[in-house]
Amino acid sequence: MSKILVSYFSASGITKKVAEKVATAINGDLFEIEPKEKYTKNDLDWTNKLSRSSIEMNENIKPEIVNKVLNLDDYDKVVLAFPIWWYKEPTIIDKFLEENDMTGKKVYVFVTSGSSSIDSTYKSLQDNFPNLIFISGKRFTGAESEEDYKSWLV
């Protein structure tokens, strides 16, 4: 049986809840992609052009990550989970992918969003990291069944 890492970034807690459900359903190890400086509610105000998230996304600023995956060689598959920001992945995800060599790993992407499609996000990842093997992309809300999570990761 292959070993699966479920890595996630969650600023508001929504993606974390879904990642926990996915990890339980597929018997994966959970890993939080944690920014050195936590996000506040004001940081996440996408309507404010001066908010931290707006500045990071508009100026491609990649926040520092406090923790590291201990040994990626232990995993055959990596699930990468995050909320959609500005129709793409948050810049902390780019930082995570730059800092962790996932060459040869199958990377399964899922996102959380109230309404945005995963299409432009998935394309952004493929464009920014052409050497990685992105298997599939899925948008989850947290209302899915355990079977939905299991069948997605085949």
What is each model feature region?
Residues 1-77, 87-89, 94, 98, ...:
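N-terminal beta1-alpha1-beta2 submodule of the flavodoxin-like/Rossmannoid cofactor-binding fold
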Residues 29, 103, 132-133:
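Secondary-structure boundary/capping positions in well-ordered alpha/beta enzyme cores
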Residues 50, 105-106:
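P-loop/Walker A phosphate-binding loop and immediately adjacent motor/lid segment at beta-alpha junctions
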Residues 72, 98-105, 129:
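Short, conserved loop/helix-junction motifs that constitute active-site signature segments
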Residues 82-83:
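Glycine-rich, N-terminal phosphate-binding loop of Rossmann-like dinucleotide-binding domains
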Residues 86-87, 115:
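Acidic catalytic loop of the alpha/beta-hydrolase fold
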Residues 108-145:
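Short, glycine-/small-residue-rich phosphate/pyrophosphate-handling segment
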